[in-house]
Amino acid sequence: MALGRAFSVAVRGLDGEIVEIEADITSGLPGVHLVGLPDAALQESRDRVRAAVTNCGNSWPMARLTLALSPATLPKMGSVYDIALAAAVLSAQQKKPWERLENTLLLGELSLDGRVRPVRGVLPAVLAAKRDGWPAVVVPADNLPEASLVDGIDVRGVRTLGQLQSWLRGSTGLAGRITTADTTPESAADLADVVGQSQARFAVEVAAAGAHHLMLTGPPGVGKTMLAQRLPGLLPSLSGSESLEVTAIHSVAGLLSGDTPLITRPPFVAPHHSSSVAALVGGGSGMARPGAVSRAHRGVLFLDECAEISLSALEALRTPLEDGEIRLARRDGVACYPARFQLVLAANPCPCAPADPQDCICAAATKRRYLGKLSGPLLDRVDLRVQMHRLRAGAFSAADGESTSQVRQRVALAREAAAQRWRPHGFRTNAEVSGPLLRRKFRPSSAAMLPLRTALDRGLLSIRGVDRTLRVAWSLADLAGRTSPGIDEVAAALSFRQTGARR
């Protein structure tokens, strides 16, 4: 009887759990038996591992081979366990165990000739290894830049199974940590490219200052998409912990770039209007993968032609908008992904959407039904609503509007003021502040609250609408450099909740 052991990581959502892999060689009919809740891809690893081991010049045990993955109750999915399985088999055939194998986590898929292929989810796996106190992790060489983002743990890159075997014996070394660029390239989109639309430009600035949700309505070609694409450029760069969190989500989704794996700027995600519920919030067979709402975490989720999106997909946005996370239950377990994003909706006023509203041929009932797909509870969560109109010839002037860098400076000052004010209460932006805190400890003056009381008495606002209006009023005050919102800021914030209102 011979026993070998290796270790790997199972990633569920953004959490990783250490998996112990044991290889037991006993007398009996030759065959490979894999136990421990493996999925189809892991079942196929028996053939990949056997071919890789033999093609690297090693013998395969002609006896009964049992491969056990523990804990047995945890579902194991994917090909990330290949090199750990191969190392356990090779260790079982050795007379003397490899000391390095007991202190190293192994991640990677094997090809038939022994090459190590890249896998998804390396960053959350390495973070889990560091959390549990493991001294070293070996990853595919193509994933080494991603693994090198985690400090405080020894990361190594391997290209072939033979190279890994030599390193375990202590005869050769493996590639070490790689230093990569720590910045994401700036977007070339500039706010100065947008012609006219001063009201909508100001709404985008307010949205950036307070992390508010925004809805733009208007005919085609007025600049709704251009404005939405320029919102991420106004937002501050991600902090170190935020960068790792966002990068981990994109790692699980398989969307990381090999050259600049660390995401330092807020992401911009724009799914197609025909996207399904699973594409928006996440899903898939086996363990659920992150959807658009999670990929937009700490960034902007832009839903163009939102009136064309299915009702079920729109209603699925309610939970992440309120909770800042999405929990996806599947047969193999529950995956939880963060989903705290800024939502930007864009819609035409009607199905025909002419450039001139006077040319519209839609009946009044058709118009109501078209935008009626956006439910009241969903719209109530949108703080800023702007009606955009087609430009006249006078809007084309030689002078450009303010650039992204100019507006970003004002946004940064407003965000810093908000962060200092809310830091003792555990918040950073105005959009995150709870309603009771706004209405009790940070309530504006009685005169400033007059427009809100009037709207509430007339049934134009819900209590949630009052809270969201106050949040926008605080953002307007921060942009103006004031210590508290006055009646002008409250009235302006209230006007942003009324479709067609002007600044």
Curated annotation (Swiss-Prot):
GO terms for molecular function: ATP binding; ATP hydrolysis activity. One of its GO terms (cellular component) is plasma membrane. SMART domains: AAA. It holds the Pfam family ChlI. InterPro entries: AAA+_ATPase, CHLI-like, Mg_chelat-rel, Mg_chelat-rel_C, Mg_chelatse_chII-like_cat_dom, P-loop_NTPase, Ribosomal_Su5_D2-typ_SF, Ribsml_uS5_D2-typ_fold_subgr. SUPFAM superfamilies: P-loop containing nucleoside triphosphate hydrolases (SSF52540), Ribosomal protein S5 domain 2-like (SSF54211). Gene3D superfamilies: 3.30.230.10, P-loop containing nucleotide triphosphate hydrolases. NCBIfam families: YifB family Mg chelatase-like AAA ATPase. Was identified as a high-confidence drug target. Belongs to the Mg-chelatase subunits D/I family. ComM subfamily. This is Uncharacterized protein Rv2897c.
